Amino acid sequence: MPDTIAAIATASAAAAVGIVRLSGAETRCVLAALFTPVDGRSAAELPPRRMTYGTVRDAEGRTLDHALAVVFSAGHSYTGEESAELHCHGSPVVLQEVLRAAFAAGARQARAGEFTERAFLNGKMDLTEAEAVIDLIDAETAEAARNAAAQVDGALRRPLEQVYDALLGLTSRFYAVVDYPDEDIEDLTLAETERTLTESLSLIHI
């Protein structure tokens, strides 16, 4: 995934604050082309996870907004890549102009769900957690939101990992006994198999 993506991360309605998000290897270069910190530093030198105030400009040097920028180092961001956010005034027109400036600086439009896709591909979340992000966004009740948030936090992943480990151990023992009958390997009993399967089913509430 060599390209750097950009998108508006907040709703398309007017609000006090709107966010433009960047992710990819060239994030700092794109950010440096857009954003000038108030202290005159290059945006490429910003420390991670610290808000910095400055000016957002387009390729012609015209001021688009005064905003806060924050960068996240690869491995410590939502996507697992070098990432950044520009917290601008929440006018849809302003956000679109900032996004166009990001494209002019080398980013491309992110596909729907691509930030979460990259998080999944980079090992920042598994498939259950990635799907839960969608459920959390689409939640229409407080209970649905709580359930989705728990899954994002690994509530489904952890028991599935336990089930996977238990079944892997079971099948490994089975194949060892079958493939090496002359070795001193303890037979896998029916009772042990039933106990492992019952415990596994209870973990996933089937």
Language model region names:
Residues 1-146, 150, 154:
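A glycine-rich (often HGG/GG-containing) alpha/beta subdomain
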Residues 160-199:
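Charged, amphipathic alpha-helical linker segments immediately N-terminal to NTP-binding catalytic cores
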